[in-house]
Amino acid sequence: MTTPKKTAKISGNEARELSDLSEDIGIRFKYQNSERVYLQGSRDDIRVPLREIRQDDTYTAQGTEANPPIPVYDTSGAYGDPAAHIDLKQGLPHIRTAWLDERGDTEILPKLSSEYGIERAHDPKTAHLRFNQITRPRRAKAGRNVTQLHYARQGIITPEMEFAAIRERMKLDELFRRPEYAKLLKQHTGQSFGANIPTRPDQITPEFVRQEIAAGRAIIPANINHPELEPMIIGRNFRVKINGNLGNSAVTSSLTEEVEKMVWSLRWGADTIMDLSTGAHIHETREWIIRNAPVPIGTVPIYQTLEKTGGIAEDLTWDLFRDTLIEQAEQGVDYFTIHAGVLLRYVPMTANRLTGIVSRGGSIMAKWCLAHHRENFLYTHFDEICEIMKAYDVSFSLGDGLRPGCIADANDESQFAELHTLGELTDKAWKHDVQVMIEGPGHVPLQRVKENMTEELQHCFEAPFYTLGPLVTDIAPGYDHITSGIGAANIGWYGTAMLCYVTPKEHLGLPDKEDVRTGIITYKLAAHAADLAKGWPGAQLRDNALSKARFEFRWRDQFRLSLDPERAESFHDETLPAEGAKIAHFCSMCGPKFCSMKITQEVRDYADKQKAQRQGMEEKAVEFVKKGAKIYS
């Protein structure tokens, strides 16, 4: 893979940076010994991507053993397809347009509906930053509901649902029937804590997806204005997903750097991406990201609304926020974090906390409530928000504005009061057939993590849980990807559907591309550990394949099968860089004489030899008896 070139920090040269966006900007991905494969759906335009990792043969004294390719879930979109044409200035292909047209329940608007969107589209000062391939937005026709939840409740299986089902199943049903995969598919029994996890790959069907969405246990974030999207599903009874954050700030980062970070996140496996920009050119940055994103994009609309007031929370209004929702919905944002559960009466509950209110959105709304001594306008206007969401199929990510910011504040009165209100709002959103997931903490000591999952399932009616970690200790700035990864693996096992990554820069600064890489790999690891623990069918296949490669000293296959092949190989080559070391039966940890796996293989060879000798002696004994057992003839 070619590493993205480094972009400058904000320098006033955004136009020059954008003019440097070549056709593939140096970010086309090349995975080691891998092949992009498409699984065909029931119609020609349902082509679901996955990646197959090819393995080397195993050579033994008995001959050659072929090792089969290992399929892995692939979020890289066109960037991971060698045959795809990539031009960030044009955006990705519109794979969902035909699906949207066929349903006949949307209309192409003559122009943008948002006042701010219209203003930005005609502002000469931002012309040099504007994405030039903007199409007119879609909206539901009058009286129509275009959400995946609405279709599911009507018994309709959409192409998005079929796509997501094939993506989750990932041809495992075929592998379970092939003898060469039999040993590799052995798996420990999982503990799913009452979840309805499929026990066989053939149970992961479009109808199963429809049922889970209809029940509110899963969502497919898929705005009708994001036709570039490759649909995916978030739910307790599916693979655990991860979200990667990006976004500029008033201090650092540029538009092109955020676009590059988005694509970089896809390379390492982000399932969704949240644009949390709070700096300059939020509207333009978001447009570039969405038009080039094959995964769902989420935002926190209150951030941009605050920017429109010059950063003065007291000046926020419902009308300004409403316009922001429409602006972002017409750009194609797939899910909104809405902090509607921060109620006026809950704010005093945080007074005795060690770290108070740490959510940016939560603190903004708390300040507005106190300044006006009025109820949170996101709560009082919630039905109107639902009307906007269902017109574009934007999913709710109901924000935890009162999440704990340290383990001392975990699971307190204010946190759970807000969670219970989020349950109330979930029920209200479902009455509009709007898809919902619930955001969770935060900072929680390990022994209290499960309580968060139990509370969410009970009070939010099994809507998908989406958590930031949680961090299980507060003593490791610079290593919070690890402190949070521990909590993430646990809460993912208990039932959380999506994990929001944490990078090493958490609490310290804005992450760069390498921090993003580390955060995503850490969270892919946590999500995979959770899939193993809850018993997702086929989850252990990659582990078993890598373990077999390790025992057989197939170093290249160990690298290829790992979550970060480049780093694994670089660590190996720091001490054994020679090409011959890639076939050596030892590494630098133990050396050639003390490698446990080499010794084990020698013991096996010796045992096989002894067994052969015993078998030969036994055969001679039988032959002796058959000949009359005479010593002398």
From Swiss-Prot:
GO biological process terms held by the UniProt record: thiamine biosynthetic process; thiamine diphosphate biosynthetic process
GO molecular function: 4 iron, 4 sulfur cluster binding; carbon-carbon lyase activity; zinc ion binding
Catalytic EC class: lyase
GO cellular component: cytosol
Record bears the keyword Zinc: yes
Binding site for [4Fe-4S] cluster: 587, 590, 595
Pathway(s) of this molecule: Cofactor biosynthesis; thiamine diphosphate biosynthesis
Residues that, per the record, bind substrate: 245, 274, 303, 339, 359-361, 400-403, 439, 466
Cofactor: [4Fe-4S] cluster
Short name of any one Pfam family annotated for the protein: ThiC-associated
Binding note for cofactor: Binds 1 [4Fe-4S] cluster per subunit. The cluster is coordinated with 3 cysteines and an exchangeable S-adenosyl-L-methionine.
Residues annotated to bind Zn(2+): 443, 507
Domain of life: Bacteria
Keywords: 4Fe-4S, Iron, Iron-sulfur, Lyase, Metal-binding, S-adenosyl-L-methionine, Thiamine biosynthesis, Zinc
EC code: 4.1.99.17
Xref: HAMAP family: ThiC
Subunit record text: Homodimer.
Biological role: Catalyzes the synthesis of the hydroxymethylpyrimidine phosphate (HMP-P) moiety of thiamine from aminoimidazole ribotide (AIR) in a radical S-adenosyl-L-methionine (SAM)-dependent reaction.
Protein name from the UniProt record: Phosphomethylpyrimidine synthase
Native species: Neisseria gonorrhoeae (strain ATCC 700825 / FA 1090)
Gene name of this polypeptide: thiC
